[in-house]
């Protein structure tokens, strides 16, 4: 099954940088498309991407949570740190000298689209992007968190576009407990907007989110110091950490982007039985947002097409960003080509 949903009307100029010692090139660009969205009708959108690797190598698309973007890791062309820095590099499963790595900015990530965004829309946008880049099939789609949801949609809507899906900490539906967390976070933003303090509302939402991403065990180890009285108020040990997380997020995220992509997680629903692509599901025991039971249900629904790996980590939903060696070992096996050795 495949869906004809959009046309690319322009390929914007791109930047190309060669690294002569390895043949690795880094390309950034964008395309303008007309996309028929599930809840918002026909929309004119820009799809921004970064493609890094050796010409002719198998292509792996890597997509993260709603805060992720097209820049995966520092490279010769774009030296700034990326969101997947610990997972990409020489000797890793995601080595640009052996794979071409494709990253893209989610629809809505620029904050310009004020409409409901479905994970199906993201998958359809990827299919259009692959057409524009003349990529017939991805060797692999590695999706973490929200990226895993998008990967499931791509596997259903455009199954011939990917050979294998690796879905980390992302299920076929949002857990009601996690949806309640996100609803309260969006209310925090709305309260800030009512008080003309939008950035404060977004910072508070991010601080709530940090509690759901991590685990009580980690907080127990890191923030067990007694509270302090500061300017007549009691301040607990974790507050500096939470304040910093909120400030960093506000500095790089537009409010509308956060709201619409947060909603997109809660709109997500797929039937696991509709996935025909071989899928490796990676679960984290202790993940409060995507519990192990939901990922077991996903794998059961996938049947013979699905397999499951379970990690135990104090980092909960953020384990894919913190347990990079363990994730890399899983990816190395999952993405191995015929004839490749470990």
Segments predicted by a language model, with ranges:
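Alpha/beta-hydrolase
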Residues: 22-23, 186-277
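N-terminal cap/lid subdomain of alpha/beta-hydrolase-fold enzymes
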Residues: 50-107
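Conserved acidic catalytic loop of the alpha/beta-hydrolase fold
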Residues: 120-140
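Flexible "cap/lid" loop of the alpha/beta hydrolase fold
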Residues: 166-195
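Short beta-strand/loop motif that positions the catalytic acidic residue
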Residues: 275, 281-283, 287
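Conserved alpha/beta-hydrolase "acid-adjacent" motif
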Residues: 288-294
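Catalytic active-site module of serine/aspartate enzymes centered on a nucleophile-bearing elbow/loop
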Residues: 305-342
């Amino acid at each position: 099954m495949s869906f004809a949903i959009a046309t690319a009307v322009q390929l914007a100029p791109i930047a190309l940088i060669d690294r002569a010692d390895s043949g690795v090139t880094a390309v950034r660009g964008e395309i303008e498309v007309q996309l028929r969205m599930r809840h918002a009708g026909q929309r004119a959108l820009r799809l921004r991407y970064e493609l890094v690797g050796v010409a002719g190598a198998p292509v792996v698309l890597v997509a993260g949570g709603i805060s992720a973007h097209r820049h995966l890791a520092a490279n010769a062309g774009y030296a700034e740190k990326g969101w997947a820095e610990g997972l990409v590099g020489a000797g890793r499963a995601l080595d640009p000298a052996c794979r071409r790595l494709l990253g893209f900015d989610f629809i809505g990530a620029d904050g310009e689209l004020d409409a409901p965004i479905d994970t199906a829309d993201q998958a359809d946008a990827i299919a259009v992007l692959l057409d524009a880049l003349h990529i017939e099939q991805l060797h692999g789609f590695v999706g973490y968190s929200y990226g895993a949801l998008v990967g499931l949609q791509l596997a259903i809507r455009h199954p011939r576009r990917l050979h294998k899906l690796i879905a980390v900490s992302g299920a076929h539906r949002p857990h009601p407990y996690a949806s309640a967390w996100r609803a309260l976070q969006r209310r925090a933003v709305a309260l800030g907007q009512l008080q003309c303090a939008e950035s404060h509302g977004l910072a508070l939402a991010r601080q709530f989110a940090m509690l759901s991403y991590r685990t009580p065990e980690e907080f127990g180890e890191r923030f067990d110091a007694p509270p302090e009285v500061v300017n007549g108020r009691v301040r607990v040990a974790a507050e500096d950490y939470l304040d910093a997380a909120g400030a960093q997020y506000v500095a790089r995220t537009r409010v509308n982007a956060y709201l619409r992509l947060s909603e997109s997680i809660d709109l997500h629903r797929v039937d696991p039985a509709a996935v025909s692509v071989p899928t490796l599901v990676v679960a984290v025991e202790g993940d409060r947002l995507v519990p192990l039971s939901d990922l077991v249900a996903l794998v059961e629904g996938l049947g013979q097409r699905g397999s499951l790996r379970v990690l135990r980590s104090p980092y909960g939903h953020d384990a894919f960003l913190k347990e990079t060696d363990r994730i890399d070992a899983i990816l190395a096996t999952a993405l191995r080509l015929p004839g490749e050795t470990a």
